[in-house]
Curated annotation (Swiss-Prot):
It comes from the Eukaryota. InterPro entries: Dimeric_a/b-barrel, NIPSNAP, NipSnap_domain. One of its GO terms (biological process) is mitophagy. The modification N6-succinyllysine is found at K45, K57. Belongs to the NipSnap family. PANTHER family: NIPSNAP-RELATED (PTHR21017), PROTEIN NIPSNAP HOMOLOG 3B (PTHR21017:SF18). This is Protein NipSnap homolog 3B. It comes from Homo sapiens (Human). One of its GO terms (cellular component) is mitochondrion.
Amino acid sequence: MLVLRSGLTKALASRTLAPQVCSSFATGPRQYDGTFYEFRTYYLKPSNMNAFMENLKKNIHLRTSYSELVGFWSVEFGGRTNKVFHIWKYDNFAHRAEVRKALANCKEWQEQSIIPNLARIDKQETEITYLIPWSKLEKPPKEGVYELAVFQMKPGGPALWGDAFERAINAHVNLGYTKVVGVFHTEYGELNRVHVLWWNESADSRAAGRHKSHEDPRVVAAVRESVNYLVSQQNMLLIPASFSPLK
């Protein structure tokens, strides 16, 4: 009897001490790197577009002395016109907070650019994004035009749609007519949204490449798989500003 009790006690003890498996709400590779990218979109009054851009051309150096400007574009096609789109890079949220505080106290920046340009802006939007784990920021080989393609995905994150989406992106890249600058996933803003920033030599070379891709069985197969996770999509053709780091 004592032997039986001893064996039962050991069995219960081992069950009690067994490690517990904890569930996680993570939906993809964890974001250990704090670096993020802020997408800012300004809708301008049509009569003020040129004045706004001229002001920034003269004063953008005041702003870029505080944080890195990735690119600055005007929207040529896709949605509302008289619109500009720009991307800013930050090390982390504390870095952005420091930059915003410093800019608010920069008299030269406030007086020469912010105050005159505020009256020219009709609406502002901002999103905080991270690069998808398998993407990195790439600089195009030469000047060109850019396309921002925005994909609204089904909830689940990169763990759900990441592999299929990557295959669809690479299928286009492998045809050689376009380059990926970066693939971004929204952290603040419209969630489950993916932004793909493409570079093309020209709008015509993009059009020719797209026509070719529609007839390529590898692209067709990859896209068919990826659209299973897609809700909607839209795009814009972007023209880089003269002061944009990405030309």
